[in-house]
A protein has these predicted regions:
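N-terminal auxiliary segments of SAM/dcSAM-dependent transferases
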Residues: 1-27, 32, 37
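Interfacial helix-start motif at the membrane-water boundary
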Residues: 39-41
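S-adenosylmethionine/decaboxylated-SAM
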Residues: 43-44, 48-218
Length: 218
C-alpha cells in the first residue's frame, strides 16, 4: 500500500494523478476517515491511481471470483468489487477487526456488502482452506512481506488460465536496493526473484505507487 509514487521525479506523480480519473466522494471520505481514525497508517492505503487501475482491470477481465490478501480499511476492496461483474464475489483476508470494521461500514455505504466476504484470521490459513482447482480470476496481495511467497504459492494454483495476480509494494520504498537490506526488504527481494522464476506466470513489474507486479497465469 502506498500514497503516491516516491520513485518518480518531482512533479511527475502529481501530473499522473491529475490526469487519472479521480476517486469519488465515497473513496475520498474513506481516505479521510482512515487518516483520522488511524493516524500514521494512511500509507497503508493504495494510491488513487492504483485504485482506478485495479478497478479498470477487474472490469476489463469481467472478473467474477477474486481474493484480496490484506484489506486494511477497504479502499482497494471497493475498487476491485466495483470493477468486477455484478454477480462477482470478492474474498477479503485480514487479521484486524479494528481496521476492517471501517471497511465493512464503507462496503455497506457503497452497496457492496453482499459481494464481499471478509474472512478474519491468518491469511495463509484462509487461502489454504479455499477450494482447489483453477477458479480465481483475480488476486491482490498487499500484506506482510514475510508471507508473500507463501500467499503466492497458495494463490497461483487456484488461478484460472489468463487470471491475474497483483502484488503491491514490490519496491518497498527503495529499501530492496540497499546493500544490506533488513529482514522485510530481504523478504520482498526474495519474493520478487521467486515470482520472476515461476514458469506458471508471465509478469511485469510496473512503477505504479510503490511498485506493482502484474502476473498473468499461463
Amino acid at each position: 500500500m502506498s500514497d503516491g509514487n516516491e520513485h518518480l521525479a518531482p512533479g511527475v506523480d502529481d501530473y499522473l494523478t491529475g490526469h487519472s480519473t479521480p476517486p469519488d466522494a465515497l473513496l475520498r471520505d474513506l481516505k479521510a476517515e482512515t487518516a483520522r481514525r488511524f493516524p500514521g497508517r494512511g500509507r497503508m492505503q493504495i494510491s488513487q491511481e492504483q485504485g482506478t487501475f485495479m478497478s479498470m482491470l477487474a472490469g476489463l477481465m469481467g472478473a467474477r471470483h477474486a481474493v484480496e490478501v490484506g484489506t486494511f480499511t477497504g479502499y482497494s476492496s471497493i475498487c476491485l468489487a466495483r470493477g468486477m461483474a455484478t454477480d462477482g464475489k470478492l474474498i477479503c483476508c485480514d487479521i484486524s477487526q479494528e481496521w476492517t470494521s471501517l471497511a465493512r461500514a464503507y462496503w455497506q455505504k457503497a452497496g457492496l456488502a453482499g459481494r464481499i466476504d471478509l474472512r478474519l484470521g491468518p491469511a495463509l490459513d484462509t487461502l489454504r482452506a479455499l477450494p482447489g482447482g483453477a477458479w480465481l480470476d483475480l488476486a491482490f496481495i498487499d500484506a506482510d512481506r514475510a508471507g508473500l511467497t507463501g500467499y503466492w504459492e497458495e494463490i497461483v494454483p487456484r488461478m484460472r488460465p489468463g487470471g491475474v495476480i497483483l502484488v503491491d509494494n514490490v519496491l518497498l520504498h527503495g529499501r530492496i536496493f540497499e546493500p544490506e537490506p533488513d529482514a522485510e526488504a530481504l523478504a520482498v527481494r526474495q519474493f520478487n526473484e521467486h515470482a520472476l522464476a515461476d514458469d506458471r506466470v508471465v509478469l511485469a513489474m510496473l512503477p505504479i505507487a510503490d511498485g506493482l507486479t502484474v502476473a498473468r497465469r499461463t
